[in-house]
Amino acid sequence: MKIINIGVLAHVDAGKTTLTESLLYNSGAITELGSVDKGTTRTDNTLLERQRGITIQTGITSFQWENTKVNIIDTPGHMDFLAEVYRSLSVLDGAILLISAKDGVQAQTRILFHALRKMGIPTIFFINKIDQNGIDLSTVYQDIKEKLSAEIVIKQKVELYPNMCVTNFTESEQWDTVIEGNDDLLEKYMSGKSLEALELEQEESIRFHNCSLFPVYHGSAKNNIGIDNLIEVITNKFYSSTHRGQSELCGKVFKIEYSEKRQRLAYIRLYSGVLHLRDSVRISEKEKIKITEMYTSINGELCKIDKAYSGEIVILQNEFLKLNSVLGDTKLLPQRERIENPLPLLQTTVEPSKPQQREMLLDALLEISDSDPLLRYYVDSATHEIILSFLGKVQMEVTCALLQEKYHVEIEIKEPTVIYMERPLKKAEYTIHIEVPPNPFWASIGLSVSPLPLGSGMQYESSVSLGYLNQSFQNAVMEGIRYGCEQGLYGWNVTDCKICFKYGLYYSPVSTPADFRMLAPIVLEQVLKKAGTELLEPYLSFKIYAPQEYLSRAYTDAPKYCANIVDTQLKNNEVILSGEIPARCIQEYRSDLTFFTNGRSVCLTELKGYHVTTGEPVCQPRRPNSRIDKVRYMFNKIT
């Protein structure tokens, strides 16, 4: 049986969850349509998603049509959940990008399309909600051409009045874009020779799969218009990106989830081989795990299975698998462009409203952060406050609601602040010697640190001979330094510096790698005190797309948010502004843009780097480490 994995992507409220329900219903996977409004859909399966009416986590379901099984990934539709979208993109064979006939191409649509093209995922445009009043499809087509891609082919004829219907396009005009994109076909056409339907279809298929042509289909998911045709298109157009001829196993974890019974579930896309129950499988070419229980989606329901084939999505109950873990041979993973998940840029303090719920809160945060790598937390050693870091304010709001509604923990939360970094100011050296108080460890370590240009990252080298200090001790020093770099003098990550391990001494047989591992961060702190550090704040590069009439306002407002516009382009009555802005200002700038353009602007951002800040440094509390904090305290007293 052919297995394909498709993604359903769209801006908020474009109808992607409703479309998924219609695909399941029309294929016979379910006997009754679910409703977003009634909370009975198969993919928005958490209480929070049903209450808010938006998809927050990746939902997975499936249907079978003739000899093809289709796994549907119903991805989130809000900007703060793009990390979840990007993780799901890596396992797709193709995508359906929904566009509301009423709303046209929205900001989120453009962001999602940018990601799909970057990762090389064949994409179909599906214009949804064609049954709404006041629809002008020619305007929607023009919107797609100007904001997404001009390389589209309209595959259907739509009759809106008096009786709405969608039929396959038979006119020759549908092939114009296909012909114009191929020199041989264009020359043949211009010379008056006839073009066979087969060669046009083959050229369309080639360009569709290399992401240079995008078919356009139409319908109404809510009223079941155009859905049967879409099912035929899905099963015939998309290919499975699997190694059918390979017997070696290869799969990748793309989602971690906790069930209502607190079972830890790992979602895996298989790219090669067959996975059997009770198999022992190597993870990321390291340790092995035994497959004791395995599930997959069959006609919209999770079912236990004994084996799974290449192309399938399987769910394992496992405590050790992590996001992006690879089962089996890593060399068999598809070579796709990787879109890096953005770093958390904000943090805040969160505490339970009822002190007796503190342990419940910590347990809940452990589960949530395990599922979402953009959400991190730690407990301050001095104040015992719980510090939460995240990407955006909507992610923060959803996390708070999740804590209350799923874990039944009421919380109090402070206004979030930006996450900074530190860089040494000058070169410095420091050594802590063995058996010299207050050093309790059987180790001597000497380190030097020197600043590097912004954006260099942390570089480490050892000038201590392996012939003198063996690899296990050397590795322990490096691990201790990496741990120490997580907290500089002001409590932030240390970056853009070179750290050299210059001196080491051990006593045989009492010295152990643990002595070096625990002493290294203490030496690092002392050498940073000699060097001093400066604070760096995150800057984002941005690209703003807005109607041309808002150019003056966008320029006028930029200085208010410390934004620096470095390039301006005009295209199709649209202005494209490029520049950079402090991360602490982006939320307000983006909100302002949305407001004065009436939602017609797009602001794409990514981390550009860190700039030196001015003014009073912002401090962050240190995280606890009971094994070295007392020693740190003693050294700080004498230095």
Swiss-Prot record:
Gene: tetM(5251)
Nucleotide-binding listed as a keyword: yes
Name used for this protein in its record: Tetracycline resistance protein TetM from transposon Tn5251
Domain tr-type G per the UniProt entry, residue ranges: 1-242
Transmembrane parts of this sequence: none
Keyword tags: Antibiotic resistance, GTP-binding, Nucleotide-binding, Protein biosynthesis, Transposable element
Role, per record: Abolishes the inhibitory effect of tetracyclin on protein synthesis by a non-covalent modification of the ribosomes.
Single GO MF annotation: GTPase activity
Entry similarity comment: Belongs to the TRAFAC class translation factor GTPase superfamily. Classic translation factor GTPase family. TetM/TetO subfamily.
Residue numbers binding GTP: 10-17, 74-78, 128-131
GO biological process: response to antibiotic; ribosome disassembly; translation
UniProt keyword annotation of Nucleotidyltransferase present: no
